[in-house]
UniProtKB/Swiss-Prot annotation:
This is Short transient receptor potential channel 2 homolog. InterPro entries: Ion_trans_dom (IPR005821), TRPC2_channel (IPR005458), TRPC_channel (IPR002153). Residues 387-404 have a biased composition (Low complexity). It is found in: Membrane. One of its GO terms (biological process) is single fertilization. The chain crosses the membrane at residues 1-21, 52-72, 96-116, 162-182. GO terms for cellular component: cation channel complex; plasma membrane. Residues 356-432 are annotated as: Disordered. Coiled coil: none annotated. It comes from Bos taurus. It is a multi-pass membrane protein.
Length: 432
C-alpha cells in the first residue's frame, strides 16, 4: 500500500506540474511563469519544484518495488532463512543506531565548535561537512591530517584528542559491538532455522489465502463498491461499540481481587470466580504435567537406545572372542602321546591283562562304566568304538575280560590237565 501511495504521489505531482504550466501559459503566454514551466533549464528550477519531488519519489518507489521480490523468498528453505536473518540484523542495526547517533552527535558538536572560529580546513567548521567527515571516518575513508592546525597548538591538541577518542569509541568499540550483535542474531536464526523457515512460509501461504482485492494493480487504488460497503460497515460497528456495546458488555471472566481493589471478587460472583480460577490452574498444571511426561519419555527412550547400542557392541565383541577361541582350538587339535596310546588306554589294557591272568574264578561284579565323554575321547584316540557305536557287554555276559570268560577258560584248562596227580593239583591250588 505504501508503494502504491508513493507511485500515486509521483504521478500526481507530474499532473500538477502540467496543470500549472497550462494555466500560466493560458493566462500569460509571454510571462515568466510560463517560461519557467515550459522552457527553463534544470539549473534554473527552484528547490521545491514539483518535478524534483516527482523524480525523487519515483526513484525511491522503484527501489522499494524491486525489494518486494524478497517477499516470496520464504518459499525456499535456504533463501527464506537468509531473509529472516537479514531482517533480524536490520532490527539490531536500528536499535544500535540510537547509541551511535548519540555519540556521533556529541563528538560532532565538540569538533565543530573547536574549528568554527578558524576556518583552516574545508572539512571542519561546517556542520554538514563535519558530519560527513566523522561518518566516513568510521569506515576508514578520511585522512587524519584534516584536524591539523600547526599555528594553533591548543585547539589542535584538543581536536586531535577528540578525534582519537572518537576513533577508539566508534571504530573499535561500537562497530565491533554491532558485529557481535549481528553475529548473535544470525546464530540464533541458524540454531532454529527449520522452525523459523516453516513459520515464515506459513505466513506467506496465509497472505495468499486471505481475501484479495477486487481490482488488479494499479486499478485497486480506485474505490470500488465493496470498499465503500466495508467502510460503512466499519463505521457502523465503531459507532455501535462505542455507544451501546461498551456500556453493557460484561467481562468474559470475573474480576480477581488485587491489593488496589481487594473487594473485586466479593459478591454473588465469588463461586464463579473461584471455579474459573480452578479451571485455569487445572489447565496450567495439566499442561505442565504433560510437558514433563513428554520430556521424561523422550529422555528414557534415549537412555534405552544408548543401552541397547552398548549391549549390541558387547555381544558383538563376545562373539568375536568366542570365534577366535574356536579357531585356535581347531588349529591346535588333539595331541597324542609318543607311545601311541594315552595313559588311560594303557591303564585299561593293563587291567584287562590282569583279569585274564587270574587263576581262581571270581564272583561276577557289575561292570565299571566310563563316562560318555571320556569314553568317546579315549575310543577315538586308541581306535576303539565309542559309546554311540558298539556297546560294552552288560553284567552277566561273556566278554574277553569278564569274570565268566575267565571262569570258562580256567575250567577248560583243568579238564585238559585231568591226568595230573592229586598232590600236584593241591600244590597248584596252594600256589594259586
Amino acid at each position: 500500500m505504501v508503494i502504491l501511495s508513493l507511485y500515486l504521489a509521483a504521478f500526481t505531482l507530474r499532473l500538477l506540474l502540467a496543470g500549472l504550466a497550462h494555466k500560466h501559459c493560458r493566462d500569460a503566454p509571454d510571462g515568466a511563469a510560463c517560461h519557467y514551466f515550459t522552457s527553463a533549464e534544470r539549473s534554473e528550477w527552484r528547490t521545491e519544484d514539483p518535478q524534483f519531488l516527482a523524480e525523487v519519489l519515483f526513484a525511491v518507489t522503484s527501489m522499494l518495488s524491486f525489494t518486494r521480490l524478497a517477499s516470496i523468498l520464504p518459499a525456499h528453505e535456504s533463501l527464506g532463512t537468509l531473509q529472516i536473518s537479514m531482517g533480524r540484523m536490520i532490527d539490531d542495526m536500528i536499535r544500535f543506531m540510537f547509541i551511535l547517533m548519540i555519540i556521533l552527535t556529541a563528538f560532532l558538536c565538540g569538533l565543530n565548535n573547536i574549528y568554527v572560529p578558524y576556518q583552516e580546513t574545508e572539512r571542519l567548521g561546517n556542520f554538514n561537512e563535519t558530519f560527513q567527515f566523522l561518518f566516513w571516518t568510521m569506515f576508514g575513508m578520511e585522512e587524519h591530517s584534516v584536524v591539523d592546525m600547526p599555528q594553533f597548538l591548543v585547539p589542535e591538541f584538543v581536536g586531535r584528542a577528540l578525534y582519537g577518542i572518537f576513533t577508539i569509541v566508534m571504530v573499535i568499540v561500537l562497530l565491533n559491538m554491532l558485529i557481535a550483535m549481528i553475529t548473535n542474531s544470525f546464530q540464533k536464526i541458524e540454531d532454529a532455522a527449520d522452525v523459523e523457515w516453516k513459520f515464515a512460509r506459513s505466513k506467506l501461504y496465509l497472505s495468499y489465502f486471505r481475501e484479495g482485492l477486487t481490482l488488479p494493480v494499479p486499478f485497486n487504488i480506485l474505490p470500488s463498491p465493496k470498499a465503500i460497503f466495508y467502510l460503512l460497515r466499519r463505521v457502523f460497528r465503531f459507532i455501535c461499540c462505542c455507544h451501546f456495546c461498551c456500556k453493557t458488555k460484561k467481562p468474559d471472566y470475573p474480576p480477581i481481587p488485587t491489593f488496589a481493589n481487594p473487594g473485586a471478587g466479593a459478591g454473588p460472583g465469588e463461586g464463579e470466580r473461584g471455579s474459573y480460577r480452578l479451571r485455569v490452574i487445572k489447565a496450567l498444571v495439566q499442561r505442565y504435567i504433560e510437558t514433563a511426561q513428554r520430556e521424561f519419555e523422550e529422555t528414557r527412550r534415549k537412555d534405552l537406545g544408548n543401552r541397547l547400542t552398548e549391549l549390541t557392541k558387547t555381544v558383538s565383541r563376545l562373539q568375536s572372542e568366542v570365534a577366535g577361541v574356536q579357531r585356535a582350538v581347531v588349529e591346535a587339535g588333539p595331541r597324542r602321546p609318543p607311545g601311541g596310546a594315552s595313559v588311560l588306554s594303557r591303564y585299561i589294557t593293563r587291567v584287562r591283562n590282569s583279569f585274564q591272568n587270574l587263576g581262581p574264578p571270581i564272583p561276577e561284579t557289575p561292570e565299571l562304566t566310563v563316562p560318555a565323554t571320556v569314553g568317546t575321547q579315549e575310543s577315538s584316540e586308541i581306535g576303539l568304538p565309542d559309546a554311540g557305536g558298539a556297546q560294552a557287554p552288560a553284567s552277566g555276559e561273556s566278554g574277553p575280560s569278564s569274570p565268566a570268560h575267565v571262569l570258562v577258560h580256567r575250567e577248560q584248562e583243568s579238564e585238559g590237565a585231568g591226568d595230573l596227580p592229586q598232590e600236584a593239583d593241591l600244590g597248584a591250588k596252594e600256589g594259586t
